Regions:
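Short aromatic-glycine-(Arg/Gly/Cys) micro-motifs in beta-strand/loop hairpins
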Residues: 1-13
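Short, mixed-charge low-complexity intrinsically disordered segments
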Residues: 37-67
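Short, positively charged interaction helices/loops
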Residues: 125-158
Length: 203
């Protein structure tokens, strides 16, 4: 995936974490390892998608390429009417049925305002569920790459999606420390949504 220099990420050399933070800083530390012949993987902290970095050339070359990643077109501003605020909106195409467009157009402020309100309402209503889902997906994606062949992976995956925190921690305990810690960090929202079972039956 393409990412900007300020994307937060984590780099692994084998099972060892060698850098974490903004992509610009992480890329430089990863380049030092790559220049010595190491194989390095960089993961987006939000999604665990692998970030591809071109390490050729000098450190300045690497940072310059990160400043304008492929697939990130520059945003150009069109003229605004007098007094119209700069909202930082992005134009993209969406497809709806005619009746949907009719309803949106009839709303106060028009289709764009109505869509933004609907999105914000949905985000507020589903914020907790979305965080759990995103946490599950990010943790699973990372675990599949870094621990897919390790003992307990399948069981740990089931515990992750079931929200069984203690079971998850128990199953990943034999994994390398850095892999274990990062998986637990990614899974935090998914697992912390469920109450801890340990000790609940004690009087």
């Amino acid at each position: 995936m393409a990412a900007g220099r300020q994307t937060h990420c984590t780099a692994f050399k084998g099972a060892r974490c060698i850098a974490a933070g903004e992509l610009g800083d992480v890329a430089l530390k990863a380049k030092a390892a790559v220049d010595k012949g190491a194989q390095v993987m960089i993961f987006d902290d939000a999604t665990s998608e692998s970030i591809e970095v071109d390490f050729r050339g000098s450190a300045e070359d690497v940072l310059q390429r990160l400043a304008q990643p492929d697939g990130n077109p520059a945003v150009t501003e069109g003229p605004r009417g007098p007094g119209r605020p700069k909202l930082g909106v992005v134009a993209r195409e969406i497809t709806l049925l005619p009746r949907h467009w009719d309803w949106l157009s009839a709303q106060p402020g028009g289709a764009s305002v109505a869509l933004r309100k609907l999105v914000e309402e949905a985000r507020r209503a589903n914020g907790g569920k979305d965080r759990v889902r995103q946490s599950q997906e990010a943790a699973y994606r990372f675990m599949s790459v870094m621990a897919g062949n390790r003992p307990g992976f399948e069981e740990a995956t089931r515990a992750l999606f079931a929200g069984h925190r203690d079971r998850f921690d128990q199953l990943i305990a034999p994994w390398p420390k850095d892999v274990r810690h990062h998986a637990r960090k990614l899974a935090a929202d998914a697992l912390d949504a469920q109450p801890r079972a340990t000790g609940l039956l004690k009087s």
